[in-house]
Amino acid sequence: MNDYILFMHHDAAGTDAASDAGLWARYLARLRGTGLFDGGSAIGPGERLRKGTPGRPCDDDLSGFVRVHAESLSAAKELLLPGNPVYEAGGTVELRELPRS
């Protein structure tokens, strides 16, 4: 079983739907029911840091993340449907494997 992270981008045309608490509650309940859910959170403002340069604000392009377990990237993609509010509203969900190193 592999670990994956789904980054929700803040680019959905239907921003109200993408941030609807009721839709998120239903989606997360479904994920919990699969036994594959491993946490998640909204993402707030932050700062980009680089040695020797002043910090600068992060872009406001990420709104949250969800972490899941799945056998493959294809299996992790299936966890978007039905119901990921950002995906359903036409927004971008970035899916990345979290390799064990």
Question: Residues of each region from the PLM?
Answer:
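Conserved, structured core segments of small domains
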Residues: 1-101
